[in-house]
A protein has these predicted regions:
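Start-transfer (signal-anchor) and selected internal transmembrane alpha helices
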Residues: 1-22, 393-402, 462-486
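Specific aromatic-rich, kink-prone transmembrane helix
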Residues: 41-42, 148-167, 181, 199-200, ...
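Membrane-helix boundary/interfacial segments in multi-pass membrane proteins
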Residues: 85, 135-149, 251-258, 332-372, ...
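Membrane-interface helix-loop-helix junctions at transmembrane boundaries of multi-pass membrane enzymes
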Residues: 210-220, 303-344, 388-392
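Periplasmic/ER-lumenal interhelical loops and adjacent helix-loop junctions
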Residues: 219, 224-309, 333, 418-454
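Hydrophobic, aromatic-rich transmembrane alpha-helices
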Residues: 229, 291-319, 326-327, 331-332, ...
């Protein structure tokens, strides 16, 4: 048993090392938004030294999108505090990315292990999720760290859905798990939060018997209350910020959006070379972002179609299985991510302008495709192992991991070979990036009574939830002991 646990650990280490290859240098890759992120860390460090905590990223509204103004700075305390100790800016940035990627590996493995108890399939699924070209490009190619953070925490939402659909109970109550998932996304990236909410809504409709029954509504209600209370300290200034910049948000939301969507070609291309933009209208695929779900997931999808149409796979979808719902949500994600989807027509409406102004491109919906196809692939490998011999199943699994590994090596090596280093030896070396101050997001001793009141409510709410969970857990333990004694 101990040996099996050790093998799982070393497999996760291998997955991490393969995807984190660009971080094992002594410099930062000069990617699209790296200068902005470095200035963000330095700016946050300076404010902390002055006794001010910036709750969200300052925004330059001249950029293509306004998502930065809604991305929380809570997790950015880690690099900022490390920077205050005297560590170099490049090292704290790379360490932050190491932490993000490690969290992605651990949380995705946890979610997949819950849905697929076989460790081997869960590990392969973890590799497929963590080695997705979209994610690697987001981390290293574009350096959209907010989106990468959201992607790292999205498996917590998947874990909630897997348990809810299969009616499993974990150590945490379902309502608390959902509240934690939403909170993590809220503090990471507003755009990924919206994608996560779409995932939740779709699964609630698809699995309405499990998620929208009496117990389901109670779980959702508790999660909403817990999320609002625990994040009131952030949501209150966020609302004030949106009200103050509502006209600008609508203006950003009315800009051309559809032309930055993906081609169907992106889901069929095997080897991608990381670029910097989504400007497909002007550049075609030249120097554009390396987006896609990866050749392994594409191959598994076509293998599934072959098995279905050849009559080999006749299994009907079960409403107790989360794979089918997530697969169809992934198909929706593919549709929404395409440049042929009528986004510009929809964004003529003020509601869609507000909902999508925080998104740089429809490609953000590719996250749903990655999640759906990953669960589909794991479900397919699980079913194939049950129907075929162990040798045939092992060949399929080995082929999947080999294709994913080669494609990942190709992309990470191209990023390393094509990107120049960015050296920051002193503050004067930082690029000239203009940050627009947002007074609504500045927390200091001089903050108003309303803001400090929200902080107090959130603090008491978090403390109350912890105490409640401890009491309930002790009560359940006593009841379990009594039943065993009886």
């Amino acid at each position: 048993m101990k040996s099996k646990g050790n093998s799982t650990f070393w497999c996760l280490v291998g997955i991490f090392l393969t995807g984190a290859l660009p971080l094992f240098t002594n410099y930062c890759l000069n990617s699209a938004e790296v200068p902005y992120q470095l200035v963000r860390i330095e700016n946050m460090k300076d404010y902390l030294s002055a006794g001010i905590f910036q709750m969200a990223m300052p925004v330059n509204w001249q950029y293509e999108h306004g998502t930065a103004g809604l991305d929380g700075n809570l997790f950015w305390l880690l690099p900022a505090l490390l920077r205050m100790t005297g560590a170099t800016l490049e090292s704290v940035y790379r360490m932050f990315l190491v932490c993000i990627y490690a969290v992605t590996v651990c949380l995705s493995c946890k979610a997949l292990a819950e849905g697929f108890p076989g460790k081997k399939i869960a590990l392969i699924g973890t590799a497929l999720y963590c080695w997705a070209p979209w994610y690697l490009d987001t981390l290293y190619g574009r350096a959209a760290i907010g989106e990468a953070l959201g992607y790292a925490f999205l498996p917590v939402m998947l874990l909630f859905l897997v348990r809810a659909v299969s009616r499993k109970q974990g150590k945490l109550p379902q309502w608390l798990l959902l509240a934690i998932a939403v909170t993590l996304l809220l503090q990471s990236s507003f755009a990924v939060l919206e994608v996560g909410m779409l995932l939740l809504i779709f699964c609630c409709i698809y699995y309405r018997r499990q998620l929208l029954g009496k117990e389901g509504w109670l779980t959702l209600g508790k999660a909403v209350v817990a999320t609002l209370v625990c994040n009131l300290w952030f949501l209150l200034p966020l609302l004030r910020y949106l009200v103050a910049y509502r006209d600008v948000a609508r203006y950003v939301g009315s800009r051309p959006f559809q032309e930055k969507g993906a081609f169907l070609l992106h889901y069929l291309t095997f080897f991608l070379r990381g670029g910097a933009t989504y400007d497909y209208k002007s550049n075609g695929l030249l120097d554009t972002a390396a987006i896609g779900v990866g050749p392994a997931l594409t191959g598994l999808f076509f293998f599934l179609l072959w098995l279905k149409f050849s009559g080999v796979l006749q299994k009907k979808n079960s409403k107790e299985d989360s794979t089918a719902g997530l697969f169809w949500c992934g198909m929706l994600g593919i549709l929404l991510s395409l440049g042929s989807f009528p986004w510009d027509w929809l964004r003529q409406n003020a509601v869609f302008q507000i909902l999508t102004f925080s998104m740089q491109s429809p490609v953000i919906f590719m996250i749903l495709a990655i999640c759906g196809l990953t669960f589909m692939g794991c479900g397919l490998m699980k079913d194939y192992r049950q129907r075929k011999s162990a040798t045939e199943a092992t060949i399929l699994e080995a082929a999947v991991i080999a294709v994913a590994f080669v494609a990942t090596q190709f992309l990470t090596n191209k990023l390393l070979l094509d990107r120049a280093p960015l050296w920051i030896r002193q503050k004067e070396d930082l690029p000239d990036v203009v940050l627009v101050e947002a007074s609504q997001f500045q927390m200091s001793a001089a903050a108003g009574a309303t803001q400090w009141g929200a902080v107090m409510i959130s603090t008491l709410g978090i403390a109350g939830i912890i105490i409640y969970c401890i009491i309930v857990r002790k009560k359940d333990t006593k009841q379990k002991v009594r039943k065993e004694a009886a």
